[in-house]
From Swiss-Prot:
The protein's name: Ureidoacrylate amidohydrolase RutB
Function noted in UniProt: Hydrolyzes ureidoacrylate to form aminoacrylate and carbamate. The carbamate hydrolyzes spontaneously, thereby releasing one of the nitrogen atoms of the pyrimidine ring as ammonia and one of its carbon atoms as CO2.
Recorded name of the encoding gene: rutB
Natural source organism: Cronobacter sakazakii (strain ATCC BAA-894) (Enterobacter sakazakii)
Bilayer-spanning residue ranges: none
EC number: 3.5.1.110
CDD domains from the UniProt entry: cysteine_hydrolases
C-alpha cells in the first residue's frame, strides 16, 4: 500500500490515503452562516467563507486520492430530548440551549434536526459513499458509530477540518487520540468559536499534546497526482 508524507508540526506524518479519513466537523449553517446559532449567540462568523472554500478544496483532494470522507452534523431532535435536561451539564453549558432560553422565540430553530440551522452549508455537499453522521455532543466519538466504522475500514489516521476548532474539532481529535488514532488538523480549514486566541490555544494543545497541525496546501501537495505517481 502506497503512503504519503504530509508536512506538519511538530513533524511530518506518513500514512496511506486508503487507511485515512478526512473529517469535516459541523459545517452547518449554525456554525458558518450569518443568522445561524453561533452568530445569534454573539460569536463572530464573518470570516468563515475562506474556511468553507479551503474545506471544499481539501474534500476534493481527499476524494481524488481515495480517502474516506466523514461529515458530522451537531444537533438534536426538535424537542431537544437528546440535548439532555437540567440533569445534564450540556443543558447548562451549550450556548445554543442557553440562547434559546434567553430568546424563547428561537426555540425549535437552533441545531434542530431538519431545520436550516442544522443543515450543512450550501457550498459543501456529501456524495454517495461518504459517511454522514449526526452527533449529540461536542465529540464525534460520543454516542456515534464513528469508531466502529473507522476500524472496519482499517483507518488509523484522521485529518480534521471544520468548526469550531476549540470545541468540536478539538474534542473529537482528543477522543481519537485516546482511541489510538493519529489526528492532524488543517489549521486554515478550521475556525474557532470565540476570539483568535481560542484558535491559537487549540492548535497549541493539538500540536503539543494530542496530534499534528498542517494546512490545506500541504495536504493537497501530499495528495497531488504528481506526488502519488512518485510513490506508485
Amino acid at each position: 500500500m502506497n503512503t504519503i508524507t504530509l508536512t506538519a508540526r511538530p513533524e511530518a506524518l506518513t500514512f496511506a490515503p486508503e487507511q485515512s479519513a478526512l473529517i469535516v466537523v459541523d459545517m452547518q449553517n449554525a456554525y458558518a452562516s450569518q443568522g445561524g446559532y453561533l452568530d445569534l449567540a454573539g460569536f463572530d462568523v464573518s470570516s468563515t467563507a475562506p474556511v468553507i472554500e479551503n474545506i471544499k478544496t481539501a474534500v476534493a483532494a481527499a476524494r481524488e486520492a481515495g480517502m474516506t470522507i466523514v461529515w458530522f452534523q451537531n444537533g438534536w431532535d426538535s424537542d431537544y430530548l437528546e440535548a439532555g435536561g437540567p440533569g445534564s451539564p450540556n443543558f447548562h453549558k451549550s450556548n445554543a440551549l442557553k440562547t434559546m432560553r434567553r430568546c424563547p422565540e428561537l426555540h425549535g430553530k437552533l441545531l434542530a434536526k431538519g431545520g436550516w440551522d442544522y443543515q450543512l452549508v450550501d457550498e459543501l455537499t456529501p456524495l454517495p459513499g461518504d459517511i454522514v453522521l449526526p452527533k449529540p455532543r461536542y465529540s464525534g466519538f460520543f454516542n456515534t458509530p464513528l469508531d466502529s466504522m473507522l476500524r472496519a475500514r482499517n483507518i488509523r489516521h484522521l485529518v480534521f477540518t471544520g468548526i469550531a476548532t476549540n470545541v468540536c474539532v478539538e474534542s473529537t481529535l482528543r477522543d481519537g487520540f485516546f482511541l489510538e488514532y493519529f489526528g492532524v488538523v488543517l489549521e486554515d480549514a478550521t475556525h474557532q468559536a470565540g476570539p483568535p486566541f481560542a484558535q491559537q490555544a487549540a492548535l497549541f494543545n493539538i500540536e503539543t499534546f494530542f496530534g499534528w497541525v498542517s494546512d490545506v496546501q500541504s495536504f493537497c501537495d501530499a495528495l497531488s497526482p504528481e506526488a502519488l505517481a512518485r510513490i506508485a
